[in-house]
Structures are given as structure tokens and as C-alpha cells.
Amino acid sequence: MQAIKMYRMALDQIPSTQREVQFRIQRNIGNAFVRLGQFQNAIQSYERVQEVQADVQAAFNLVLCFFAMGDCERMRSSFKKLVAIPIEDPVGDSAHVVSGVDADSSDDDDDGDDDDDHDLRRRRYFESGTLETELESRRMRATEYITTAARLIAPVIEKESWIEGYEWIVKTLEKSQHSKIGSEMTIAKSLQYLKEKRFKEAIDVLKGFEKKEKDLMARAANNLSFLYFLEGDVEQADKYANVAVRTDR
């Protein structure tokens, strides 16, 4: 409780212009309440951050709190809010700006030198190690938070059946900008079938990846090879092992 008191004193000293610092302190207050097992107080701290700014870390922490409390309905609502937070695409942003500059320069050949200088400044702004790298780092952190939250709550959000929980997670992700994580969760669903020795269902799920992206297809083929090997079907096991090798070279 002493740490929380000190955090609140610090929060009172931070000017309103330094919102990022305020958010970090508010998140730390929530983290301290989590350590004390006071999840409702932690939720209030994280929600204060969310009210002002969509924050991936605070949204993820809310999912964890509702998971700890066993509140399935609020797990679903908080997960929806987490995946709805917009994540900037560094590749898309840089490509858009650079292509936009090229388009402008082609309109007026008389200003070619000025356009070249402007193009150079833009390229330096987006070169590796600057904004582009920071955006990529944020995207990777957001992906990790969302994937972890999805794996955590998928088996428990539907009390009647873990299968329905995975299906809800996959559908929610496919409707968002994180459809690839939805594919990851489909593979996780097949592994859950495997844990329960329901090989046929696991195989059916994995076969749906035969026309997907190469990295997902390779992983699915690798798992299919293993499943067929467990069932004693050496021919099919060899077939999918070769598919995995060819796809992931």
C-alpha cells in the first residue's frame, strides 16, 4: 500500500501536459493492486487510462484481471476492446509517404531539385532505426499481448465447451486487423484437440491451412505429419513432412 500511496503522490505532481508519464504511473498503480490481489481496484486504474487513450498494455492487463476473477462476459468485452485498438503499420506508412512524394515530384519537373531534397528528407525520416523501427516494435508488442490474451481466455470464456471459446476468439480476430493471429489460434485449437487425443478433429482443422500463407501452411503440414505418424499412417506422414520442408525452405 505504501507503493500505491507514493505513486499517487507522484501522479499529483505530474502536469497535465505529460500524459504519457501519467499513464505509466496509473498503470503501475494498477499493477500494485494486482500484486495485492485487489483486482477491482486494479481494473479501475487501468480503465482510467483507457478512458483517455486507447492503450494496448492497459487493455491487456484488463483481460488478465477479468481472467483472474473468472468473469467470462467481461473477458470477452475487454478482449474486443484490445483487438480494436489501431496498430500503425510501419511498412505501409513509409511506403505511402515515399510513393506520395514520388507522385508529387512527377507533376512538376521544374521543381525537380526541391522534390529530390524533400524525398531525401522523407526517406531519412523513415529509414531503419528511426520511426519505422519504433512502429515495428510497437506492432510486435501489440501482437504479443493479443496472442497471449487469446491463448489465455480461449479455453475458458465458454463454460459449456472450450471449442466454442476458440471459435469465438478466431471470429473476433478475423473481423479485426489481426486476422493472422486468428490463424495462429486455429492452429492452437488443433493442438488442444491433440492434447485430448482427438486426432481426427485435429487433422480436419489443420487441413484447412493447405491453401493459406506459406509459414502457416508449413506449420500445419508439420503438425499433420506428426499426427499421421502417431496414427501409423506412414505414407501420409511422409507426404506432409515433404510439404512442410518444401514450403519452409
Language-model features, listed with the residues they occupy:
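Non-TPR docking regions that flank or precede TPR/alpha-solenoid scaffolds in eukaryotic proteins
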Residues: M1-R249
